[in-house]
Amino acid sequence: MSELTGGIIECILKIIVVLLIFSALAGFGTYLERKVLGFFQRRIGPNYVGPYGLLQVVADGIKLFAKEDIIPQNAIKPIFILAPSIAAITAFIAMAPIPFFPEFEIFGYVVRPIIADINVGILFVLAVSSCGIYAPLLAGLSSGNKWSLIGGARAAIQFLSFEVITILSLLAPLMIIESLSLIDINNYQQGSMLDWLIFKQPLAFGLFIIAAYVELNRTPFDLLEHEAELTAGFATEYSGLKWGMFFIGEYANMFATAFILSLVFCGGFNDWGFIPGGIAILLKVCFFIFLFMWVRATFPHVRPDQLMRMCWKIMLPLALLNVLITGCILLF
């Protein structure tokens, strides 16, 4: 077998593994979130289907597959069908340059847990993730429903505004590292905990994690589908597998964002004291996933005007100031 053929087979196997694992994690994420929310609200959460309610995910999946797939009469059919696919596809493509774990060896063969090691990895993630805006936007425009249309309009405003904050918040750490490769970013922090960028760029971390909440459409920033105002927003007319693809895309993005936060700001998969690197990054990712769910249980919704005011009048000046200060420190 030639080296090229072996590389192609290895890449295909990695893609299949990532698709299977993160699709399963998306389903398990719903169970975990319901358990966490139940804990904060002094409830038990899912506990009837299987031991500790673990088979609730399977029951939900069966229900989802069994639901009738309905397309509204006034919908623009091709775009209506395309929108959920964009949500899921962009979420998984964005994972290509993410190094999930350190290298390990199986039967003498060195495995690198990354699909594509490109030197502009973080730029690729941002570019592909930003294409995900087309999913709620097209869904809202094509559904023929006023609530969906308002949800799609909010998606365009919300995502485009916070793309600016996301990029500017990452600009300062990238100026320090002088590389766009996620592996280089990870290797930069391989010393002690004081080398983690969360301590060198705390403002950038705060801005990035808030922007991540907004772009993931998580509470308290889920203005695209706020139940009290828009029923289900852009997804009002979706059911069955099409709705499921939106949900898979959202949770896959959430896990990918947790990996990005761990890699860029929290030391990545470097050894953490006596804890091996692979276990260390899993602990960090689990912490950020729990944090996403904790915030949902804690904070009330914000209004769209409050969100835009926070973006343009507070976060944008802070992000620009952080870039300016970092540039001056590096220059002088």
UniProtKB/Swiss-Prot annotation:
Membrane topology designation: Multi-pass membrane protein
Keyword set, alphabetical order: Cell inner membrane, Cell membrane, Membrane, NAD, Quinone, Translocase, Transmembrane, Transmembrane helix, Ubiquinone
GO molecular function terms attached to this record: NADH dehydrogenase activity; oxidoreductase activity, acting on NAD(P)H, quinone or similar compound as acceptor; quinone binding
Protein name listed in UniProt: NADH-quinone oxidoreductase subunit H
PANTHER family referenced in this protein's UniProt entry, alphabetically: NADH DEHYDROGENASE SUBUNIT 1 (PTHR11432), NADH-UBIQUINONE OXIDOREDUCTASE CHAIN 1 (PTHR11432:SF3)
EC number: 7.1.1.-
Pfam families the record matches: NADHdh (PF00146)
Family annotation (NCBIfam families): PRK06076.1-2
Gene assigned in the entry: nuoH
Main enzyme class: translocase
UniProt GO cellular component terms: plasma membrane
Subunit and interaction comment: NDH-1 is composed of 14 different subunits. Subunits NuoA, H, J, K, L, M, N constitute the membrane sector of the complex.
Gene Ontology BP term (one): aerobic respiration
Summary of the function given for this chain in its UniProt record: NDH-1 shuttles electrons from NADH, via FMN and iron-sulfur (Fe-S) centers, to quinones in the respiratory chain. The immediate electron acceptor for the enzyme in this species is believed to be ubiquinone. Couples the redox reaction to proton translocation (for every two electrons transferred, four hydrogen ions are translocated across the cytoplasmic membrane), and thus conserves the redox energy in a proton gradient. This subunit may bind ubiquinone.
Family: Belongs to the complex I subunit 1 family.
The keyword NAD appears for this protein: yes
Location in the cell: Cell inner membrane
Membrane-crossing residue ranges in chain numbering: 8-28, 44-66, 78-98, 120-140, 157-177, 196-216, 245-265, 274-294, 312-332
Cross-referenced InterPro entries: NADH_UbQ_OxRdtase_su1/FPO, NADH_UbQ_OxRdtase_su1_CS
Reaction equation(s) it catalyzes: a quinone + NADH + 5 H(+)(in) = a quinol + NAD(+) + 4 H(+)(out)
Superkingdom, natural source: Bacteria
